[in-house]
UniProtKB/Swiss-Prot annotation:
Positions of L-threonylcarbamoyladenylate binding: 126-130, 158, 171, 175, 251
Catalytic activity as recorded in UniProt: L-seryl-[protein] + ATP = O-phospho-L-seryl-[protein] + ADP + H(+); L-threonyl-[protein] + ATP = O-phospho-L-threonyl-[protein] + ADP + H(+); L-threonylcarbamoyladenylate + adenosine(37) in tRNA = N(6)-L-threonylcarbamoyladenosine(37) in tRNA + AMP + H(+)
Source superkingdom: Archaea
Residues the record marks as active site: 437
Binding positions (ATP): 333-341, 350
Ranges where the Protein kinase domain occurs: 327-520
Name the UniProt record assigns to this protein: Probable bifunctional tRNA threonylcarbamoyladenosine biosynthesis protein
Pfam families reported for this sequence: RIO1 (PF01163), TsaD (PF00814)
């Protein structure tokens, strides 16, 4: 049955945009807010949206069929901007006497990417001004596998650009300048499936190197971080398709890195047409249309905007569970996101492999640093009572250690094993060791006991924040891969409290970290 065209209105931040979408895009009109100087001013942006929204919508509707529904960006975003769009959408829906549909902005980026690529079950890197997230579909929702712990990559780049007096938006200008640059070392912050950009931006601002070198290195470092956590998500989920969405996705170097990584993993990669990458009304209209087909409409009285609306809060009624999604097979069981593991004579050799997408100097630095740190911290964790493999030999890129003949925790999740895992992590944190990558792939189960492996991102810290981030990584993985995540998290917490005196303070911090990611 033919649905008919849906009107979509986007206005979460910079761009006021509207579109009409039927089986394909009919018309798209955008009118972005451009500040005189500095970054976005929410009230000024809202005033801009209010001043142009009527003309933008009139231009979209002129000469086209009357929409059968009105969709609008309900969140996340800037409250003043969202309220302008929400008010207009309600008025139009009542005027046309058609259904109203509230669309999650992040989910809309994912759905327009799926439409443009034809991919069915991809991992999605969403890289924009305010958001940096790696998402994928599981059990009726889009799960967030990893995300920024501080600011979005686009905002990070724009902050650096403003500090150097570069015009807005800063991303294209930095990309242009970077073409003539050379690499200089800058901070690289990846914490399991999450990442952080504030330290990188601060170091780039303070760097005394030529501007072209700093721009080049800022891109090389930030985009390598994004590519690394995206590869982890592909490895963790066993998915074989990747889509890049969001305004930062227009950067050719980021596209090149992701394409290179996917080629090495035999994964398919797609980037939508530029008109679908940044914030746009087409993604709202298209997502509204698929939601309308599944009956996901809003009564006007329940259409309040939500500035903190996360993608994983949306019940995805318009998709079916892909076949095999319960198993999440990892086609790279012998080759994870960072290393190849070879087994021989009761030993496991973990060999860190070079990544073609990373700058060679950065690649060598990370391999050497992570190999040395891993060997040292495995030994320290073992002294603290944590079950880890015994180290036998170390080289520049290889650790030879005892082979633990077990299965990954992700393949046998249970409350009993998560409670045991909590006790183990409690011992680790009590010894002031932070693992840095507490995913369910890095716990092995052998004879009913859990063993902790892969200390490549580990470090020492007595900081509450660092230990909270450690647990946040694990909780994110549980939420994105298990329908019983709440039960499993409670079991972990019970075990953790047994061994970690500061457990409540750390767990409260983990909750604060989760809330920070609502809209950054």
């Amino acid at each position: 049955m033919k649905i008919g065209p849906v009107l979509g209105i986007e206005g979460t931040a910079w761009n006021l945009s509207a579109a009409l979408f039927d089986d394909d895009l009919i018309k798209l009109v955008s009118h972005p807010y451009k500040p005189v100087q500095g970054g976005i001013h929410p009230r000024e942006a809202a005033q801009h949206h209010a001043s142009v929204i009527t003309s933008v919508i009139e231009e979209v509707l002129k000469g086209n069929p009357t929409p059968v529904a009105v969709a609008f960006s309900q969140g996340p975003g800037l409250g003043p901007c969202l309220r302008i769009v929400g008010t207009a959408a309600r008025a139009l829906a009542l005027s046309f006497d058609v259904p109203l549909i509230g669309v999650n902005h992040c989910v809309a980026h994912v759905e327009i990417g799926r439409f443009a690529s034809g991919f069915d079950d991809p991992v999605v890197l969403y890289a924009s001004g305010a958001n940096t997230q790696v998402l994928g579909y599981l059990q009726g929702r889009y799960r967030i596998f990893g995300e920024t712990l501080d600011i979005g990559i686009g905002n990070a780049i724009d902050k650096f650009a403003r500090s150097k007096g570069l015009p807005h938006p800063g991303g294209p200008e930095i990309e242009r300048i970077a073409k003539n640059g050379s690499y200089i070392p800058l901070p690289y912050t990846v914490k399991g499936m999450d990442l952080a950009f504030s330290g990188l931006v601060s170091a780039a601002k303070d760097a005394s190197a030529p501007l072209e070198d700093v721009c080049y290195s800022l891109q090389e470092t930030a985009f390598a971080m994004c590519t690394e956590v995206t590869e982890r998500a592909l490895s963790q989920t066993g998915k074989e398709q990747l889509i890049l969405v969001g305004g930062v996705g227009m950067n050719k170097r980021l596209q090149e890195m992701l394409s290179c990584m996917c080629e090495d993993r035999d994964a398919a990669f797609s980037v939508p047409n530029p008109q679908y990458l940044g914030d746009n009304g087409a993604m709202i209209a298209y997502t509204g249309r698929v939601m309308l087909e599944s009956g996901s409409v809003l009564p006007v009285e329940e259409s309040r905007v939500n500035p903190s609306y996360r993608a994983d809060q949306v019940l995805v009624t318009w998709r079916e569970e892909p076949s095999g999604s319960e198993r999440h097979p990892d086609a790279y069981s012998a080759r994870g996101a960072e290393a190849i593991v070879r087994f021989c004579d009761g030993a496991a050799s973990k060999i860190r492999v070079s990544k073609r997408y990373r700058h060679p100097e950065l690649d060598r630095r990370l391999i050497a640093e992570r190999t040395r740190a891993e060997a040292r911290l495995i030994a320290e964790a073992r002294k603290a009572g944590v079950r880890t493999p015994i180290i036998r030999e170390i080289t520049q890129d290889t650790i030879i250690m005892e082979h633990i003949d077990g299965v990954k925790l992700k393949e046998c999740l249970s409350p009993e094993l998560l409670e045991e895992t909590g006790r183990m992590v409690g011992k680790l944190h009590a010894a002031q060791i932070v693992h840095g990558d507490l995913t369910t792939c890095n716990f092995l189960v052998h004879d009913g006991k859990t063993w902790l492996i892969d200390f490549g991102l580990a470090g020492t810290s007595s900081d509450i924040e660092h230990r909270g981030v450690d647990i946040h990584v694990l909780f994110q993985v549980l939420e994105s891969t298990s329908k019983d995540s709440d039960i499993l998290k409670e079991a972990f917490i019970q075990g953790y409290r047994e061994k970690m005196p500061l457990a409540d303070e750390i767990l409260n911090r983990e909750h604060e970290i989760e809330l920070r990611g609502r809209y950054l």
